[in-house]
UniProtKB/Swiss-Prot annotation:
This is Uncharacterized protein MT0910. PANTHER family: BNAUNNG04460D PROTEIN-RELATED, VOC DOMAIN-CONTAINING PROTEIN. InterPro entries: Glyas_Bleomycin-R_OHBP_Dase, Glyas_Fos-R_dOase_dom, VOC. It comes from the Bacteria. Residues 25-151 form the VOC domain.
Amino acid sequence: MSLSGPRIGRAHQQQGDTMAINVEPALSPHLVVDDAASAIDFYVKAFDAVELGRVPGPDGKLIHAALRINGFTVMLNDDVPQMCGGKSMTPTSLGGTPVTIHLTVTDVDAKFQRALNAGATVVTALEDQLWGDRYGVVADPFGHHWSLGQPVREVNMDEIQAAMSSQGDG
């Protein structure tokens, strides 16, 4: 069993006396939070996450968990400073996060509201953007930022550049 992503549920191939693991390249965010169990509950409520599994350490803190959000794997664990050179790695302890996790969704208004109802706060209000998406950003209760966007109109690069240029005229 793997809690690392796309190979979950994939068939393995027999090679001699050993099983070869069928690995598919992937990119998955791995979030560090205070209270990973509560974070899992939040992500289920806010983003309709499906829990793939969790691994508690001897003290009950989660040393690893995996979720499926919007069709992709997101991994997370409780903050374990001793695994990071003695440093806490949560967004709260670091004074914020430079990373925003983006979800392209359908019915962005409902999904944005669902995240707010689950306890997220607005970072950037949901609005139609010059690049053609209806887009907004929320912060989860654990300090991670999530942008939600839905393409609502086709635009070309000339339109985007013209819109950017006109923003300076004012």
